[in-house]
């Protein structure tokens, strides 16, 4: 996916803000998507098919199964940030923010097992 696409610019901006090594789950409609290196790491952990859009690796899963996949990340010692659209901007993309971070240390209190 071209870095020039507005959605990819939003994704990369958030990716730069979160701690290094944290997997970014980016909600697009009814799916959480992972791109680039996060997709390559997530695919085997979660048992997801790694695909590509252009040169960009990607994978994803339905939003309603997020706790199932969070548990898989936590079992592998990975921290995860979930980003969602918090405000439509009228340009078809919207403003995204991290709405939740789950780490191996916080997973139990968030009921992720």
Q: What name fits each language-model region?
A:
Residues 1-113:
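Basic, polar low-complexity surface loops/patches
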